[in-house]
């Protein structure tokens, strides 16, 4: 099934430049309302520095496009009741396609980040053909969750994929020839043969970081290093309340951080953090002790009793995260390290506590200490994050850092 967009906002963008002052101020207002949940016109004018008249014109325009809705009037203050404006969940939608090393996800979210529909499929390793088959079957299922009128408000497809997915073949347990097919795979071209919508591609953990920034981050950290524990560990960076992707879109790739170590001959060498603090390492450890490891990939809520092997892995992960945190803090003065992953909440909390302990015992001379907190999106962060890409591109002040990737 081919989905074609009839979204009025997409048509509007084709007719006028989105780089003008009006579009910039629209993004500022949408971002502000997203951050605060809702806000009246007077508060928006105060926080943006725009005139009351300019705010009124923009708010009225966004309301006419069904992107904003009026909330109940706030009474009890001097003067007339104020009317807060909030994002309209039905105002726009994004589809996310997450390409994982062990699974595929297809997710539909609305403008405020609610998951309207989601599909998941496990795999031993990702192949080009299995992805296209999954997408073609799944896209029609997602569309069924919306009325024909709302389906016109789907703004695009965000794709989250591991950086250089064809590398680390031994660690991924996949044939090199199969993974090499991804080198020449053009996501935009192939997906557009199935879905006639704009396609945006980014790193999987950058996508997860964007989900935390847009729909989580309850402590309102302005600058934080985001860490996602998946099949391979990875991360993202937020600076000045903005997703920082770097020139080539791979900022925060902590999985590739080399950790000094001694080899069997006592010589100094290094090992990437991927090989210490990733889920596939736990899988190897459990298999070595005779455990069935299917639960790691089939459930993100509860793993049952995995005994001392899990405890050893948690300690190993925390050791790596504390090292990564110190290295990152030496380069940029982050407020916090935010840890999430495709793992049960109780396991994540143990990792956070263990990381805090190891950091507290580390040598911080010349480096400021930071908060260490759990992420708030969970195992679906990558999926929600890539579905959020079309929304960010259209409505967020972060759009410039994403659109060129």
Regions found by a protein language model. Give the residues of each.
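Glycine-rich phosphate-binding loop of actin/hexokinase-like ATP-binding domains
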Residues: 220-276
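Glycine-rich phosphate-binding loop and adjoining helix at the ATP-binding site
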Residues: 115, 119-223, 350-360
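ATP-binding/phosphotransfer module of carbohydrate and carboxylate kinases, centering on a glycine-rich
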Residues: 1-71, 77-120, 126-152, 262-405
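Conserved phosphate-binding catalytic cores of ATP/NTP-utilizing and phosphoryl-transfer enzymes
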Residues: 70-94, 199-224
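Short helix-capping/turn signature of helix-turn-helix
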Residues: 35-36, 215, 230
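Short glycine-aspartate micro-motif
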Residues: 94-98, 154-158, 224-228, 234-236
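Short acidic-glycine loop/turn motifs at beta-strand connectors
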Residues: 110-112, 167, 239-240, 261
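Short, active-site-adjacent cap segments at secondary-structure transitions
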Residues: 164-167, 207-209, 234-235, 244, ...
């Amino acid at each position: 099934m081919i989905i074609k967009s009839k979204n009025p906002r997409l048509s509007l963008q084709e007719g006028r430049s989105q780089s003008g002052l009006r579009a910039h101020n629209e993004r500022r207002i949408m971002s502000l309302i997203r951050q605060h949940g809702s806000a009246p016109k007077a508060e928006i004018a105060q926080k943006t520095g725009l005139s009351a008249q300019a705010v009124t014109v923009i708010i009225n325009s966004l309301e006419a496009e069904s992107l904003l809705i009026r909330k109940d009037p706030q009474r009890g203050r001097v003067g007339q009741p104020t009317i807060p404006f909030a994002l309209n969940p039905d105002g726009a939608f994004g589809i996310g396609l997450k390409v994982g090393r062990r699974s595929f996800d297809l997710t539909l979210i609305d403008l405020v980040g609610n998951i309207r529909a989601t599909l998941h499929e496990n795999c031993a390793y990702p192949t080009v053909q299995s992805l296209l088959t999954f997408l073609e079957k799944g896209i029609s299922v997602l569309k069924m969750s919306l009325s024909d009128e709302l389906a016109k408000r789907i703004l695009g497809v965000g794709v989250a994929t591991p950086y250089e997915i064809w590398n680390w073949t031994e660690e991924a347990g996949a044939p090199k020839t199969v993974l090499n097919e991804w080198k020449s795979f053009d996501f935009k071209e192939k997906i557009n043969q199935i879905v006639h919508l704009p396609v945006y591609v980014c790193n999987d953990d950058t996508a997860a970081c964007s989900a935390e920034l847009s729909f989580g981050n309850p402590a309102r950290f302005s600058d934080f290093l985001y860490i996602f524990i998946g099949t391979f560990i990875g991360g993202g960076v937020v600076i000045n309340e903005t997703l920082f992707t770097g020139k080539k879109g791979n900022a925060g790739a902590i999985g590739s951080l080399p950790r000094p170590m001694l080899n069997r001959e006592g010589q100094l060498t290094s090992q990437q953090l991927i090989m210490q603090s990733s889920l596939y390492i736990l899988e190897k450890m459990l298999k070595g002790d005779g455990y069935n490891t299917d639960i790691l990939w089939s459930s993100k809520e509860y793993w049952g009793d995995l005994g001392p092997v899990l405890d050893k892995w948690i300690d190993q992960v925390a050791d790596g995260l504390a090292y990564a945190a110190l290295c990152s803090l030496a380069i940029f003065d982050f407020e916090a390290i935010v840890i999430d992953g495709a793992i049960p909440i109780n396991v994540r909390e143990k990792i956070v506590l263990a990381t805090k302990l190891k950091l507290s015992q580390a040598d911080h001379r010349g480096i400021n200490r930071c908060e260490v907190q759990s992420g708030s999106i969970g195992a679906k962060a990558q999926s929600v994050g890539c579905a959020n890409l079309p929304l960010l591109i259209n409505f967020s002040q972060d759009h410039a850092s994403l659109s060129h990737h």
